[in-house]
């Protein structure tokens, strides 16, 4: 049947119907193309494939994060194949666990953010504000329009964010002040894509002596949100994360929080 003739194409079509992002589709297609026999790999073949993925074409070792992503893409394909009755077990079960160092998010200092907003021209100020004060990704900054600001309900609608899922971000007075007078079309002033937004933010940050990226601006929003609320579920929802495991790296305790914890631990009874 068609599934057996080209299972990878059938899987990618199913993923596309589930409205995954183009970036996810591209990455998955690239990884699945390296499988020597997508539906016929036994334990030895699976481990041999995994061994071949440990190094890049230039001979340098692949980062743990990259390997983890490759394993996840392959595992999801095989999981789909099992659901379709094409496999009886998931070959990913034979793969070793990828151990990644758990790093805490690095955020833009508040003083730097103040100067970045103060010195920016209007379009750049809006980009910085949407990242640092609304937690938007570069693709979301590029896509958001003035029509997405819902003042009646006090939210900013993020249409088809990561994974092509809509979500709402609460509006703050500070964010609205930085965005300025509303207009028509894109909030950033012109049509842009994710790469252009990320590059523009990177250039602006470097020009102002700040060794940070667009993602570090977003990390600032999530870190402040978690510090103020302590609610990881709400933080995951507002950030557009599908699970809590990826949000905990933004949980940076304030000195007051740590002091209260130390006082509680220092009491007996």
PLM regions: where:
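Basic, Lys/Arg- and aromatic-enriched nucleic-acid-binding interface segment
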Residues: 87, 99-106, 110-138, 142
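Active-site-proximal segment of tyrosine recombinases
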Residues: 140-141, 212-213, 222, 230-241, ...
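Conserved tyrosine-mediated DNA breakage-rejoining catalytic core shared by Y-recombinases
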Residues: 143-179, 245
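DNA breakage-rejoining catalytic core of tyrosine-based enzymes
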Residues: 87-89, 100-115, 163-173, 183-187
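Catalytic-site neighborhood detector that most strongly recognizes the C-terminal catalytic loop/helix
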Residues: 160-163, 232, 239-264
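Active-site/catalytic core of tyrosine-dependent DNA strand-transfer enzymes
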Residues: 172-211, 221
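N-terminal core-binding DNA-recognition domain of tyrosine recombinases/integrases
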Residues: 9-104, 209
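Short pre-functional
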Residues: 75, 125-139, 155-156, 223-224, ...
């Amino acid at each position: 049947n068609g599934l057996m003739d080209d299972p990878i194409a059938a899987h990618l079509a199913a993923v596309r119907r589930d409205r995954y992002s183009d970036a996810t589709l591209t990455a998955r297609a690239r990884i699945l193309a390296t499988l020597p026999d997508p539906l016929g790999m036994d334990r030895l073949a699976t481990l041999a494939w995994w061994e071949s993925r440990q190094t890049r074409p230039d001979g340098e070792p692949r980062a743990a994060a990259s390997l983890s992503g490759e394993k996840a893409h392959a595992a999801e394909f095989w999981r789909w194949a099992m659901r379709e009755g094409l496999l009886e077990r998931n070959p990913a079960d034979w793969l070793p666990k990828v151990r990644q160092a758990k790093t805490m998010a690095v955020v833009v200092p508040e003083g730097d953010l103040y100067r970045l907003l103060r010195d920016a021209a209007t379009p750049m100020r809006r980009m910085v504000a949407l990242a640092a004060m609304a937690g938007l990704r570069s693709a979301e900054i590029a896509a958001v329009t003035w029509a997405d600001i819902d003042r009646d309900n006090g939210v900013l609608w993020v249409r088809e964010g990561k994974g092509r899922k809509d979500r709402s971000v609460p509006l703050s007075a500070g964010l609205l002040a930085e965005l300025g007078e509303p207009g028509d079309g894109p909030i950033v002033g012109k049509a842009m894509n994710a790469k252009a937004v990320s590059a523009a933010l990177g250039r602006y940050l470097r020009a102002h002596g700040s060794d940070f990226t667009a993602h570090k601006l977003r990390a600032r929003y999530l870190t402040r949100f978690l510090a103020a609320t302590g609610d990881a579920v709400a933080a995951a929802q507002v950030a557009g994360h599908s699970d809590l495991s990826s949000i905990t790296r933004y949980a940076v305790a304030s000195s007051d929080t740590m002091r209260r914890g130390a006082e509680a631990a220092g009491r007996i009874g």
